[in-house]
Amino acid sequence: MSTDSYTPSQEPGSKRLKTGESVFARRGVSPSTGGVASAYGNESEKKPSWLQTNKSDIDGKYDKYGERRNAHTTTRDSRLDRLKRVRQKSAEREDVGHEGDEGDEDEGILPYIHLQAANPAIIHNEKQENYRTFQSRISNRENRDINSIVRAHYNQRTQQAKQQGSRVNSPIYKMRNFNNAIKYILLGNWAKHNPEELDLFSFLDLCCGKGGDLNKCQFIGIDQYIGIDIADLSVKEAFERYTKQKARFRHSNQNSNRYTFEACFATGDCFTQFVPDILEPNFPGIIERAFPVDIVSAQFSLHYSFESEEKVRTLLTNVTRSLRSGGTFIGTIPSSDFIKAKIVDKHLQRDEKGKAKFGNSLYSVTFEKDPPEDGVFRPAFGNKYNYWLKDAVDNVPEYVVPFETLRSLCEEYDLVLKYKKSFTDIFNQEIPKYFSKLNKNLIDGMKRSDGKYGAEGDEKEAVAFYIGFVFEKV
C-alpha cells in the first residue's frame, strides 16, 4: 500500500451484512414546532420509556445530568428483551455493524447507484459542468457575530442543496466520501457500548447538521440518538431524513435496511447553552431517562467554540456531564500542527486585501490577523481565520484549535486523550480493515483516476488539514 492510496485485494461488498429488523414500532410524525423536530407523534401515542414524561419534580435537573436510572421498567421488559435478542443476533455475524447494500447510503452517494462506469472518476469529471456550486449570500458579515454567520451559512446550505443537482457531480464529491469514510472508521473503532452499565446504546450528536451521520449510527448499531444543532433548517432536514429512512421498506418482507434506532432532534447552541436547557423544554424528563450516553460526537464543529474559553468550557461541560464513565468523545477538527507547518515553512500568500492565506483550488485559510511566525497562537482562544471549501463552506469564520490546549482543558473535565491522528494516517492505517465493511457506493466514490482508492491532487492537502480525536470519560 502506498502512502496516499489503497489498492484492495478484492472489490468491496463481497461480505455485506444486512441490518436487522427494527425492534421499535413505527412512530407517528408531527410537524416540528418551536424550532424542534421530534421523532414522535401525538402525545396519545405511546413513546419509548426514555422519552416519557417523568412526573416527578425535575427541579435541579442539572445536578442529575450525570446520572441515569435503570431503563428497565415492567412495561418495557418485552421490548428490551427483543432488542437484546436482535443485538445478540447481529453480534454473531462475521462483520458486525456492516451496512446493507441498499437504502442506507450517505447523502451524495445515492445518485451513484445509477451510474454504469468502470472508473467513477472519469464520469465524475465529465458531469461537473451540470452542477451548481454552492455560494452563500450573507450580507453585512463585518457586523454579525459568528453564531449568526454560521447559522445563516448552514441554513442557506440546506436550502440550496436541493437545487444544486446531483451531488455526485460536486467538485468535492470524492473528498466528501473520503471524510465520510474517516468518520465511519472513527465511530466503528471507538463507539463502544457497556450493556452492564446502560441498557441502551445511546449517541449524542452535538452540531448534528442535516443528519449526515445517521447512517453511521445505524452502522455501529445504536439504540437511541439525540441530535442538536444551531441551524434550525438543518435540524428540520435531519429530522426529515431520519423519518424517511425510518419509514423506508417498513413492511417486513421488503427490506430491512432502515433505521432501527429511535431519535429526537432539537435546535440549540451547545457552546453557549447547557444540554438540559436545550432538551428539557421540548422533551420533559429526557435528561433523567436518556442520560448519560455512550458516545458524544462533534464532527467538523468544535473549532467554532474556540472563539472564547467560556464557549469551550461550556462545550466540555456538556460533553463530560452527558457521558457515562468509560464513554467516548469523538470528533474531527482542523489540525493546529498542519496550520503551524504552513506558517513556519513560509507557505503563506497574500490575498487582494493583503491578508495572509494558504490553500489550493479546493480550499483556503485566510487569517484575520497575521499569524505568529512560530505558528504558536497565544492566547489560545479567538484566533480567527476564514475557511473556504469549494461547494461547501463559503468563507465562514473559524478558530484555530491549539490541540495541547484542548487536551489540557479536557483533562480538567475528566476526559483523557486516547487517540489523535491526521485523516491521511487514519485512512492509510485503517482502510484495509474497513474496505470490505463499508458500503460499496461509498468506496467507489473514493476511486482515483489511476484506479486506486484515496485522495488525489488538491484533495490530498484538503483532507490532510483535518485530524480525528477520541477522549474517554474517566
From Swiss-Prot:
EC top class named in words: transferase
Binding, mRNA: 179-180
Swiss-Prot/TrEMBL site (mRNA cap binding) positions: 210, 216, 241, 303, 398, 466
One Pfam family recorded for the sequence: mRNA_G-N7_MeTrfase
GO CC entries: cytosol; nucleus
Gene that this sequence comes from: ABD1
Name by which UniProt lists this protein: mRNA cap guanine-N(7) methyltransferase
mRNA cap 0 methyltransferase domain: residues covered: 170-474
Biased composition (Polar residues): 1-12
Function statement: Responsible for methylating the 5'-cap structure of mRNAs.
InterPro entries: mRNA_G-N7_MeTrfase_dom, mRNA_G-N7_MeTrfase_euk, RG7MT1, SAM-dependent_MTases_sf
Region of interest (Disordered), ranges: 1-106
Organism of origin: Candida albicans (strain SC5314 / ATCC MYA-2876) (Yeast)
GO molecular function: mRNA 5'-cap (guanine-N7-)-methyltransferase activity; RNA binding
Superkingdom field: Eukaryota
Record field: catalytic activity: a 5'-end (5'-triphosphoguanosine)-ribonucleoside in mRNA + S-adenosyl-L-methionine = a 5'-end (N(7)-methyl 5'-triphosphoguanosine)-ribonucleoside in mRNA + S-adenosyl-L-homocysteine
Residues where S-adenosyl-L-methionine binds: 183, 207, 229, 269, 299, 304
